Amino acid sequence: MSLVKKKNDDIRIIPLGGVGEIAKNMYIVEVDDEMFMLDAGLMFPEDEMLGVDIVIPDIQYVIENKEKLKGIFLSHGHEHAIGAVSYILEQIDAPVYGSKLTLALVKENMKSRNVKKKVRYYTVNHDSVMRFKNVNITFFNTTHSIPDSLGICIHTSYGSIVYTGEFKFDQSLQGHYTPDIKRMAEIGEEGVFALISDSTEAEKPGYNTPENVIESHIYDAFAKVKGRLIVSCYASNFIRIQQVLNTASKLNRKVSFLGRSLESSFNIARKMGYFDIPKDLLIPINEVGNYPKNEVVIIATGMEGEPIEALSQMAQQKHRIMNIEEGDSVYLAITASANMEVIIADTLNELVRAGAYIIPNNKKIHASSHGCMEELKMMINIMKPEYFIPVQGEFKMQIAHAKLANESGVAPEKIFLVEKGDVIHYDGKDMVLNEKVNSGNILIDGIGVGDVGNIVLRDRHLLAEDGIFIAVVTLDPKNRRIAAGPEIQSRGFVYVRESEELMKEAEDKVREIVEAGLQEKRIEWSDIKQNMRDQISKLLFESTKRRPMIIPVISEI
């Protein structure tokens, strides 16, 4: 039975996130007058985003066309695929489609943010067919580090638009992690119009090390440990957590988790049967001291840098629950991103100083949850797409993936390297990239959504780098005189007691500026404040080569 609904006229593919970056996945596919959102993820802030908690895609384009949106389709349950859903649903109404575990994690996110909105959830699997006016949508099982991951297939009259989600190929994994290569091959034979595919490891040659080999290595490493064992692991890597549980059970060690980020997702997945946990294996963290050190494993978990931060606090004897002791062994079951390498190196030194032994990783093992070069080429060769769109990676990774596609037979002119907001448009004859829609980042700080922009970040950088300089003056405008002050206050700029001459010079300059302003025919407070900013900034820079944030405060009596 054909899954094509009707002859289509117009197709648009628009990345709003997940290109030029490893996170924040969001891809819009429009077929005629229907719009479909593929993933809705978040990103954790970069170092320069001071005070920002998370980053989500700007969905202004979707809001402007919300009547066309038929649903949010989710590939898997990681935050960079589902983390923005609760924020989006506060702004628009849309049904949400995903696997059983993925939707359970979305609902938990909604609950944790106290988003009380009635949402239509549709649980899908590899057998599901979702029927719409212009297209049908089906799904296929993929392998990732979290169970129930899906690829998404939009059937059009030109062929299928396939979104792989984040994937790798590993035949050693079974059950909830087994890739459905047979169904992928069927989709390829039916005809793939465009393949939107994960580029994260496009620069890594070969294949990933099979997970059964990795588990064997973990066992060999743990079996040599005589004392307490601490494992650093991402809360999102369910495969690695299961392997640590398996190994601990074989070695007759109890397991305890250290890290709040894991608690909700782990408990949800555990209740739903996605973890295989022997009876009495787990113990509360406050009971670890009741067991001999050679009979426990502590898994320090979290998102992004949280596991490393926990280890650092433990090494410095500052952790609220547990600290490193002489004779502890530490195993890092995480892959270091570029911006984490220095932090990890510093933490390892702290751990060694505190008396811990760092279990070395086998350099021959490459344990990623994303496909390496040969796995990416395998997906391309299975799907045989007419057009290819590399996503989910930094731009250099997208370029590397584009090269793999070309080597696999996709013509260069049919490979599209896109940035956020680019519109790939097919009108029935030609596929072109000649439009752009509104796109970018929405920064979330606490409960504020989108109220932190470039100007706020600039101010935070100024405060962090050069401090703040405040000049307070009280005026008597009726008599055109200074009633009190100027009073100078400074934080993070200079040590006031050692800079009394500079403070006096600044005070005199403020007085001079204010008195000049008071002599004007019409007193303009804004002009006086701006003159204070400009002239004080110049004075301070000439003396210190620093540019603190200058805040004039003028009050009246």
Curated annotation (Swiss-Prot):
EC number per UniProt: 3.1.-.-
Annotated signal peptide: none
One term under GO cellular component: cytoplasm
Cofactor(s), by name: Zn(2+)
Binding-site list for Zn(2+): 76, 78, 144, 166
CDD domains the UniProt entry points to: RNaseJ_MBL-fold (cd07714)
UniProt superkingdom: Bacteria
Database matches in Gene3D superfamilies: 3.10.20.580, Metallo-hydrolase/oxidoreductase, Ribonuclease Z/Hydroxyacylglutathione hydrolase-like
GO molecular function: 5'-3' RNA exonuclease activity; RNA binding; RNA endonuclease activity; zinc ion binding
Cofactor remark from the record: Binds up to 2 Zn(2+) ions per subunit. It is not clear if Zn(2+) or Mg(2+) is physiologically important.
Primary location group: cytoplasm
Keywords: Cytoplasm, Endonuclease, Exonuclease, Hydrolase, Metal-binding, Nuclease, RNA-binding, rRNA processing, Zinc
Coiled-coil positions: none
Keyword Zinc: yes
Pfam (any one): RMMBL
Broadest EC class assigned to this enzyme: hydrolase
Location(s) in or outside the cell: Cytoplasm
GO biological processes: rRNA processing
Binding site for substrate: 366-370
PANTHER family the record matches: RIBONUCLEASE J (PTHR43694), RIBONUCLEASE J 2 (PTHR43694:SF4)
Database matches in NCBIfam families: MG423 (TIGR00649)
Role, per record: An RNase that has 5'-3' exonuclease and possibly endoonuclease activity. Involved in maturation of rRNA and in some organisms also mRNA maturation and/or decay.
Protein family per UniProt: Belongs to the metallo-beta-lactamase superfamily. RNA-metabolizing metallo-beta-lactamase-like family. Bacterial RNase J subfamily.
Oligomer and partners: Homodimer, may be a subunit of the RNA degradosome.
Name of the featured protein: Ribonuclease J 2
Organism from which the protein derives: Staphylococcus haemolyticus (strain JCSC1435)
Gene: rnj2
